[in-house]
Amino acid sequence: MGRAFEFRKARKMKRWSAMSKAFTRIGKDIVMAVKEGGPDPGSNARLRAVIQNAKAVNMPKDNVERAIKRASDKSQGDYKEVIFEGYAPHGIAILVETATDNNTRTVANVRSYFNKCDGSLGTSGSVVFMFDHTCNFRINAEGLDPEEIELEFIDYGAEEVFSDDDGILIYAPFESFGAIQAALEEKNIEILSSGFERIPQVTKTLSPEEATDVEKLLEKLEEDDDVQSVYHTMEES
């Protein structure tokens, strides 16, 4: 198994366990998708993907429909996607993806978390190169062979395919998302969820005490409502 498999296994139980946080995150994704491509999932591939993700975390259908309706209102502000890069204690690189309607607030908050936890907020480009930007799809495994899926989807950019109790996972470079989504839909393969992740190219092992220092920063970042995802180069235990 490759890095994507190990990365997914280590993170599976650690991040985004709070359902309310997941709903907030998906609500913002819906707003951004509707603002970009309109409220019709049939003609908006990004919105289709977000709705699938909402189903995957059991977000009520009413919540999804309200979010789409709200996003369609011209008075509804848009969210801007902003990436922050920096270092936690002990040389651990941190990459933070946010979706904000108030960049001044978000910058101030993120900077304060780094400062309070003895980290340092860096400049654009300072750590992003340490992560591979990937896309992923979880599909219904019923009647499918992971090895055949891997062979079939190599032509669309798939790099890793593996299965677990929840289905078959396909990992590919970020730019392959559209081609794989279109191919899965064309072949009538059920997409359970999809998304993007940044996988560290190299990780660093810390002592339990050092890891605790880093976790303090990760927790502060992940609790912020503007934060969508947090990635780091600490080896997950």
Regions from the language model: what does each represent?
Residues G27-V31, P89-G91, V127-M130, E159-V161, ...:
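A short alpha-helix capping/helix-coil boundary motif
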Residues T123-H133, D164-D166:
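Short, surface-exposed recognition loops or helix-turn segments adjacent to catalytic cores
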Residues N136-S237:
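Positively charged, low-complexity, intrinsically disordered RNA-binding extensions
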